[in-house]
Amino acid sequence: LSPEGTTQRLREFDRIYVRLQTRSGQVQLGDYDLKLGEGTLYGVQRKLQGVLLTAQLPGAGPVRRLTIRASGAVSKGIYRRQTIVPVEGVQGPYRLTGAAGEPFVLVLPGTERVYLDGQLLDRGTDYVIDYATGELTFTPRHLITAERRISVEFEYTTGSGTRSLLASQAHLELGHSRPVAFLEVAALREADGRRFGETFGLTRADSLALRQAGDGLAVRSGAEQVPFDPEAPYVLYTREVRALPDGTTDTVYVALTSAPPPGTPVYRVTFSRVGPGRGRYVRAGQTVNGIVYVYRGPGQGDYEPVRLLPTPVRHDLVGLRAGVHLWPGWTVGGEWARSRYDANRLSPLDAADDLAGAYRLFLRIDSLTLSVGRLAVSLRRQHLDAHFAAFGRLQPVEFARRWNLDVRDLAESSGASVQPVAETADEAYLTWRASRSAAIDLELGRLRRPGQFRGERQALGLTLGRETTTQFRYHGELIRSRHEVAGARGRWLRQEGRLTVPLGAGLTPYIAALHEDRRQQALHTDSLHADSPAYLEVRPGLAWQRPALQADVSLAWRREADVWQGRRLPSGRTWTLQGRLQYTPGPHFGTTAELGYRRRRTPPRFAARYPLDQTLALHWDGFFRSPGRLLGLN
């Protein structure tokens, strides 16, 4: 691991194992990375500590090859996918939290996959991470603004591991002179131990709460009465009763801004994130004593004044995958999987939805010769039952954006990816390559969630020229959607283009353009919803690359529009300057400097929504190594 991913615990970097190898397989004892069924419904990727067996048996007759893999281990971490809400002008640190809202977790080194606007980032180049604190900071290569989209997949440990994982897979390949068919079966189980309560120090009251919670959130009160202390290193709250519009009342915690009247109860309150639209409180900002949470009402927030209790889980999954190679480059096949996911082994409630299934059907043509050029085709259908639980993400990172879904419609990801509702997706991909320097990509798709959502998507990609010569690339997509639950219909147009013109001597000027127009309207009216932004961005730049030098500078102009009282109005203009210089003349010296500067002009009506008008981010690092490595500086 590079220094840009740090931890103060040396044991988190240790990999201790014993490996025994023969001609037909191997056995590994100790630490290992398990990657099984990658890209399938039953795929899993984990850092484990246990036994891994791999056997490759020679073929006989119609059997070309048989591969068997088996694993029995203790999970070193818990898988989690977290969406981070960016703050305008703040590069970090952003904290990764546990599935139960734990604010301090140990991220397993090397397990994180950080996505910014759907693109996978590189550690050190695009971000730095402290594994001991779970804090993530972005470099000036990417200026973080409120409209950016950040998603992180990682494994973490709370230091009290009780979870084990058993997995097995067999892959059979048939054919004589060439592969004609394949068959693959897999079975997996991940579960917490029976001494779960002792490990986490749960009280009798906690155990009762877990038993009564079913598959829902098990909580204990997050409020603790304390004496009033104006110098307390945490935010103090009082409690009051408020009347709601429907005539009911609610007990509300209100942050203190001054000394309360004598005798008024004062509380220290812990708030936990329970999910979008599932809480009553929102984060209102940072004070000297900590983060302040403000009451918004039932279903209007992401946080609750509670402590989330960890729940012991059991996750079983069996899968089958088969395919036939009709001709060289032609493959037809399918997958089937069935899962059992008990989110709370201590509770007999909510067991009716533990079992669920899923399947995929696909046809893939790698290359079909035409009179002009070659054609590649891929057709796929994927169906997921409600409550189907996978060991990893089954949809693209930007699945919500891909289909104009709300973030709260996505699968949950607290140790497993649990599908919230039944869903069927049909997609087709066609690529026509007229020559080595000309290609057209076409994508068609539809998504159905019976009684809740349906969407249609079309995308077009165009490539003219090669990277070493003048090249033009374009990608555009149009999404139409109808969300019955939200009572909204949408139309989302997105376009992106880039032109590069190499001039020689390592100089390459370029110009890129981005455009989006999202219109969300009520089902039976034409008025725009608040989440209907539009923007146009143009970014010219110049790249210079030499054997020891790499430089890139760009200046972007962006015009934005947002909805104000049902109408779309200009909401701001921004200028963004970004530059990067890397100089490495040899193995003994190297330096990198990065600059990001953004200036925004916002109309008064949108000033509260976009309070910052300037953002500046700088980063510089370097190293020196003397000959013979007698002296080293970083």
Locations of the language-model features?
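Surface-exposed, low-hydrophobicity segments enriched in Gly/Pro/acidic/Ser residues
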Residues: 1-634
